[in-house]
Structure formats: structure tokens, C-alpha cells
């Protein structure tokens, strides 16, 4: 009988048997997998216990949240219904190319460090270092923001309870979920995401029926698309601003790369999740924006006033109320709470795994690379929780510090997306340069090299367009707050580069080797697929005989 250790795979940044190579990137050496004996005890690692449905819902749930339920109204108000649709469609396409780029690498090299590890191996270790720490910091701060937001949402029902009580309770709950086996995290995230998906589906059904007049009175149809300056208002700057809001709404989809390191069958689950998630997200966002724009004119002040503290004027709430759902505010408040809880849960998972991967790459203290018997990186989880807790305290006792921390993490998601595009471009070129064939890749990104290059250009435009108004009036304080993530990222990159004397890795020296652990996971996935095909064939033959 196989032991628990035998059934698990090492999916850290530096995989089993990997030793640091000159230049800072890892070179994997063959380390046989054997049963534990007195002379050979495998080190504990995170475990591959996430199923395909978990991976799909984690990515889907990570991108359907308050950005859709609350902030979507702002894009319609500022750019008009047409501008909002263009922004979300363009960002959706950009995200699709990023996801296919990440998917190609993640199915070939499924590691917990994801894009940070890939940047270290395919581009420059300094890039991976900066991306990893930036991403960890972003999600640690986001956990603090989400716990604060959740307390505001909960006060809708319990106005007498102090905010800090709810915040600490939510932070403790998130910690408990993440300290259990990764399967518990996956199940929790699956059901939280399912609540959001069902809400959007109900909203679309009720909204479309209202648009054509079956419920809610007279049919508005497309009158709001020709109202005053609609469908486009504010010109190109307004549309570019809508790009920024839409971009923040889609952030979280890159979590699919981190889950690859703990997926039971990454070569099957990652491609399937990418296909499902892209179309669902794009349709959910585009149709939701369309319904809101049809039912609420872009001039409505309610579109600008929606926030977590006043869910009664969320675009979703207004549409439900127009259709005659009296309890709309309470229902949407519950949905927003699940969204915030889901975001905090995903954020804790992502930041913990990134810190663990950085330690495996020897880019963080080694203690953060330790895991318990269940494959949970407890030191990394404790460190992340501590940072989130301190950030939360700063929101109570030092508002300026809290504002600085939030601003410092503001553009990290976009920086990660840009890094994914660069890493994939380098990976594919190195793969072919070193004599490999595309047929060796179990999943290939679409429209290479056009796809990742277009996505990179769009991502840079979105970063630049975050706060054009402040450039117009030369508001240096606002510019500094908005773009603070960029210089901090550059400081991390340059500091590591100069200290370790790293260079851009030549294509013919890029490390494309797969450790025995990765090959074993690939073989197991292939065997499972073959067994499923044989089982299906036997069933068909049996049916034919009958």
C-alpha cells in the first residue's frame, strides 16, 4: 500500500532535487521517488488535491465579485453604455490571451510559484523575485481590505456591532479555512463561487425579461443606448478609464496558475478551466453590463453612488427592485458578503502559496518553505496573516499608512499579467530554439505571438491610463498614489539584479527541464486519460452487444 508521501507530488518553485544554478535560476536534477525508509525520507510538500471543478470555480469566483456587483455602474456612468461594453470586451479578450499563455506553461510545468517561478526560469531571476514579492504583498494587503469591507457589509444587519469585531472574525475564519487541507479551501471556494454564479444567472434572466417588457412594466429595449450622448460619452479618455475599472474586475483569473501546483491533474484541469472560465466571465460581464445599461440611463447618479456601505443602490439591486423583488437589497448584501469572503479566501491562499514558492526558490527565508503533514505551508500562512492583521490595524489607527499600503499594491495584478506575457513569449521561443516540437505541448496558447504581444500592449495602456486626469492637472500626490506600485516593483527588481548580478537568460540556456515529480504527474494524468478512454470504449462495446 502506498504511503501518503508517495501519493503526493512536490510542486514548489524549486522542485524536488532542484539546486540553484548560476545566474539565479533553477536547474532540476533527477531525484528518484522512493518509499520512505530510515535512510530516505521525502520532504513534505504541498499536495495535489484540487479537482478540475475546484480549479474552474476558483478562477471564476476570483473574477466575479464586487467589481461586477458594485463597480460596474461607474463604467457605464463615465464612458456610456457603449464605452463600458467596449472596455469589458477588450479587457476580456486581453485576459483570455494571458490565461492561454499561463495555461501553456502551467500544463508543461505546474508549480505553485506560477508566473513568478516562470519569470525566474525563462527571463531573469530578478523579474521573478520582484513579481513574486509584489504579488504576495498585494494579496496580503487585499485580505486586509476585504476583511474591512466584509465588516461594512455585515453592519447592514448588525449596525450596533463595532466594525473591528467583524473584521477580526472574518480574518480568523479565513485563516481556519486555509490551515485545513487544500481540499477544504477548494470546496469552500467552489460553493462561494457557485453562489455568485447563480446570482448572475438569476440577474440576467430577470434583467432580460425586464428589458423586453415581460416583467417590470414598459419595455425600455435599447432606448438608453441613444439617450443624450450615448452610447459613448467622454471620448477616448473615458473609455480608457473604463478599461482600468474593467481590468480590476477581472483580476484574480491568474489564480489558475497558482492552483496548477496543487491540481490533481493539471494537464486536464487547466485547459478545461481556461476554456470554461473565459467564456463564462466574458458572457457574464458583457450581458450584465448590457442589462444594466438598458435599464438604468448612464446619467443616473445611482451608478456612481454604489459601494459596499450602501448596497441599496448597487446596479444589481436597482434592477431587481425594478422587477418587483422587494428584498433585493438584503439579497444582494448577502451575495456581496460571499463575494468579499471569497476574495479574501482566495487572497490568503494566493499570497501564502507565493511566499512558499519564493522560499523554495531561495528568494525568501527558508522557514516559509516548510509545510505540515497535510501539505499546508503553515509558516507562510502565519506570516501572511500577520501582515494582513497589521494592515487591518493600520486602517483603524493610521489612515495615511493604510492608504499608502493599499496604493502600493494597486497595480500589482496588471504587473503580474505583463510578466505572464513576457514569460510565455520567452518560454515558447526557448522551447523551439532548443529543438522541441509544439506537438510536445499538451496545451498551446492561441495566436502566438500575436496574442501575448497584444495582451502586453493593452496591459501597458491600462496601467498608463489609470489616472489620466491627474496628469492633465499635474496632481503629483494623486499620481504618486495611483502609480506607486510601479516604482516599488522596479526597486525590488533592480535591488535583486545588482546584488546577485543576474542577466537576461539566453534562449539556449533557459531551463526547460522537468523534474521526475513533474514527469510523474504528467504520466499519471496520461494514464488516467487512457483509462477513461478504455472505460468509455468498453461501455460502448457492451452497449453494442446489447
What is each residue range found by the language model?
Residues 1-73, 77-82, 96, 100, ...:
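Membrane-interface "cap" regions at the ends of multi-pass membrane proteins
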Residues 45-46, 85, 158-162, 194-329:
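Helix-loop-helix junctions that connect adjacent transmembrane segments
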Residues 46-47, 57, 68-166, 481-485:
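Extracellular loop-to-transmembrane helix junctions
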Residues 111, 134-148, 245-263, 326-366, ...:
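Membrane-helix boundary/coupling elements in multi-pass transport proteins
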Residues 116-121, 147-167, 199, 257-268, ...:
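Helix-loop-helix connectors at the membrane interface of multi-pass transporters/channels
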Residues 117, 124, 156, 242, ...:
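TM-loop-TM module centered on a large, flexible mid-protein loop between adjacent transmembrane helices
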Residues 164-222, 251, 274-278, 282, ...:
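Membrane-interface loop-to-helix entry segments
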Residues 192, 368-378, 417-481, 503, ...:
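C-terminal membrane-solvent junction of multi-pass transporters and transport-like membrane proteins
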Amino acid at each position: 500500500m502506498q504511503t501518503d508521501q508517495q501519493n503526493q507530488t512536490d510542486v514548489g518553485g524549486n522542485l524536488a532535487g532542484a539546486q540553484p544554478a548560476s545566474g539565479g535560476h533553477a536547474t532540476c536534477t533527477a531525484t528518484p521517488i522512493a518509499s520512505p525508509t530510515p535512510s530516505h525520507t521525502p520532504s513534505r510538500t504541498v499536495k495535489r488535491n484540487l479537482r478540475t471543478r475546484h480549479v474552474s470555480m476558483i478562477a471564476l469566483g476570483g473574477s466575479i465579485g464586487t467589481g461586477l456587483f458594485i463597480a460596474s455602474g461607474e463604467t457605464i456612468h463615465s464612458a456610456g453604455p457603449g464605452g463600458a461594453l467596449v472596455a469589458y470586451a477588450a479587457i476580456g479578450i486581453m485576459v483570455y490571451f494571458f490565461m492561454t499563455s499561463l495555461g501553456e506553461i502551467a500544463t508543461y510545468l505546474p508549480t505553485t510559484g506560477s508566473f513568478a517561478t516562470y519569470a525566474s526560469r525563462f527571463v531573469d531571476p530578478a523579474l521573478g523575485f520582484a513579481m513574486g514579492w509584489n504579488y504576495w504583498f498585494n494579496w496580503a494587503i487585499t485580505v486586509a481590505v476585504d476583511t474591512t469591507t466584509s465588516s461594512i457589509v455585515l453592519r447592514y444587519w448588525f449596525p450596533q456591532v463595532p466594525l473591528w469585531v467583524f473584521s477580526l472574525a472574518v480574518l480568523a475564519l479565513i485563516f481556519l479555512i486555509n490551515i485545513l487541507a487544500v481540499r477544504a479551501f477548494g470546496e469552500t471556494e467552489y460553493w462561494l463561487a457557485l453562489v455568485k454564479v447563480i446570482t448572475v444567472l438569476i440577474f440576467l434572466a430577470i434583467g432580460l425579461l425586464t428589458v423586453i417588457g415581460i416583467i417590470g412594466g414598459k419595455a425600455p429595449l435599447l432606448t438608453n443606448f441613444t439617450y443624450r450622448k450615448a452610447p459613448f460619452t467622454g471620448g477616448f479618455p473615458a473609455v480608457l478609464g473604463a478599461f482600468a475599472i474593467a481590468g480590476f474586475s477581472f483580476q484574480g483569473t491568474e489564480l489558475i496558475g497558482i492552483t496548477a501546483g496543487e491540481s490533481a491533474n493539471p494537464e486536464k484541469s487547466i485547459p478545461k478551466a481556461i476554456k470554461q472560465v473565459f467564456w463564462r466571465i466574458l458572457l457574464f460581464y458583457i450581458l450584465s453590463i448590457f442589462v444594466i445599461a438598458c435599464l438604468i440611463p448612464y446619467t443616473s447618479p445611482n451608478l456612481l453612488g454604489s459601494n459596499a456601505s450602501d448596497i441599496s443602490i448597487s446596479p444589481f439591486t436597482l434592477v431587481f427592485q425594478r422587477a418587483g423583488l422587494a428584498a433585493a437589497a438584503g439579497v444582494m448584501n448577502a451575495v456581496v458578503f460571499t463575494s468579499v469572503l471569497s476574495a479574501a479566501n482566495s487572497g490568503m491562499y494566493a499570497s501564502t502559496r507565493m511566499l512558499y514558492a519564493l522560499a523554495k526558490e531561495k528568494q525568501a527565508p527558508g522557514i516559509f518553505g516548510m509545510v505540515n503533514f497535510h501539505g499546508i505551508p503553515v509558516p507562510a500562512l502565519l506570516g501572511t496573516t500577520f501582515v494582513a492583521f497589521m494592515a487591518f490595524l493600520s486602517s483603524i489607527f493610521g489612515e495615511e499608512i493604510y492608504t499608502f499600503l493599499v496604493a502600493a499594491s494597486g497595480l500589482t495584478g496588471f504587473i503580474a499579467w505583463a510578466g505572464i506575457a513576457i514569460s510565455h513569449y520567452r518560454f515558447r521561443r526557448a522551447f523551439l530554439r532548443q529543438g522541441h516540437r509544439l506537438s510536445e505541448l499538451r496545451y498551446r496558447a492561441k495566436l502566438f505571438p500575436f496574442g501575448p504581444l497584444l495582451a502586453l500592449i493593452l496591459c501597458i495602456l491600462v496601467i498608463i491610463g489609470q489616472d489620466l486626469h491627474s496628469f492633465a492637472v499635474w496632481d503629483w500626490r494623486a499620481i504618486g498614489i495611483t502609480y506607486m506600485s510601479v516604482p516599488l516593483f522596479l526597486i525590488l527588481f533592480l535591488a535583486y539584479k545588482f546584488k546577485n548580478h543576474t542577466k537576461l537568460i539566453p534562449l539556449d540556456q533557459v531551463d526547460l527541464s522537468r523534474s521526475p515529480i513533474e514527469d510523474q504527474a504528467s504520466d499519471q494524468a496520461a494514464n488516467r486519460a487512457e483509462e477513461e478512454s478504455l472505460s468509455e470504449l468498453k461501455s460502448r462495446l457492451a452497449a453494442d452487444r446489447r
